[in-house]
Amino acid sequence: MIFTKEPAHVFYVLVSAFRSNLCDEVNMSRHRHMVSTLRAAPGLYGSVESTDLTGCYREAISSAPTEEKTVRVRCKDKAQALNVARLACNEWEQDCVLVYKSQTHTAGLVYAKGIDGYKAERLPGSFQEVPKGAPLQGCFTIDEFGRRWQVQ
C-alpha cells in the first residue's frame, strides 16, 4: 500500500469498450460512444478525467493481453464506481474494470453484470507508477503523460 496526497475517499475506474475480437474501427466507435455515455451522466458515473490512456489487459476470450484505448473516471463513491462497472459489463461486454482508491492506490477488479450485485477481487499490491526503463510484465496502463502504471 502506498499513500498519496490525493483527496480521500475517491475511486478511480479504468474502463474500456474495446474487445480483442473486433476491428479497430468498431472499437473506436464503441470507445467514443462509451465516453459520451459517461460524460452525459456525471452524477451517475462520476467525471471522465482522461480518454487518452492505453491499457494492456487480458480478456477471458483471449490467450494474451491486448492494448486498448482506456478511460479514467473519477468517482466520488463506491456507488458511482459500481455504476461504471455495470455499464462496462452490460453495455460493452467487459469482463471487469480496474478500480483503485485515491490515497492508497489499493486496487481490485470489479465485475457487475445484470442490474444488481457485483463481484470484486482485491489485487495484491497497489496501482503504482513503473520507473522508466523498468520492464512491464502482464497487464499495465500508460497514462496521458506517458507514465506507465501497474499493480505491483
From Swiss-Prot:
InterPro entries: S-AdoMet_lyase (IPR016290). Changing E67Q: No effect on enzymatic activity. The keyword Lyase applies. It comes from the Viruses. One of its GO terms (molecular function) is S-adenosyl-L-methionine lyase activity. Pfam families: S-AdoMet_lyase (PF23780). Induction: Expressed in the early phase of the viral replicative cycle. Keywords: Early protein, Host-virus interaction, Lyase, S-adenosyl-L-methionine, Transferase. Homotetramer. Interacts with host METK; this interaction induces the polymerization of METK into filaments that are enzymatically inactive. This is S-Adenosylmethionine lyase. The lineage of its organism: Viruses, Duplodnaviria, Heunggongvirae, Uroviricota, Caudoviricetes.
